[in-house]
């Protein structure tokens, strides 16, 4: 181990030592990186929460649209049945008219 005129730095050959100041600087640098990562994660967590809320709202909208489409389908089916009855009635009337004309 040798001293090279700097009280903040000592070296040992083939393996290194660091001063308390260097270690604290390294630790502070890592802490700052961790804080940035933590802030990024918090921000991303908030974005995910907002996306989940949007997804839930869109799911509710899809459910409402599905109900509307189902109701419209029922209405179309009812209208089809009504048209079928009207057609049958017209056919009966047409047959009666044909009978009257043939007499």
Curated annotation (Swiss-Prot):
Record-linked Pfam families: DUF16
Disulfide partners: none
Domain of life: Bacteria
InterPro entries listed in its UniProt record: DUF16
SUPFAM superfamilies: MPN010-like (SSF144266)
Family designation: Belongs to the UPF0134 family.
Protein known as: UPF0134 protein MPN_484
Organism: Mycoplasma pneumoniae (strain ATCC 29342 / M129 / Subtype 1)
């Amino acid at each position: 181990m040798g001293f090279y005129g700097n009280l903040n730095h000592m070296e040992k050959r083939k393996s290194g030592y660091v001063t308390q100041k260097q270690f604290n600087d390294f630790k502070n640098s890592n802490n700052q990186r961790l804080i940035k990562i933590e802030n990024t994660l918090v921000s991303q967590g908030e974005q995910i929460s907002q996306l989940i809320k949007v997804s839930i709202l869109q799911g509710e909208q899809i459910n409402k649209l599905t109900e509307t489409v189902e109701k419209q389908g029922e209405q179309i089916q009812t209208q089809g049945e009504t048209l079928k009855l009207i057609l049958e009635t017209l056919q009966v009337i047409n047959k009666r008219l044909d009978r009257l004309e043939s007499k």
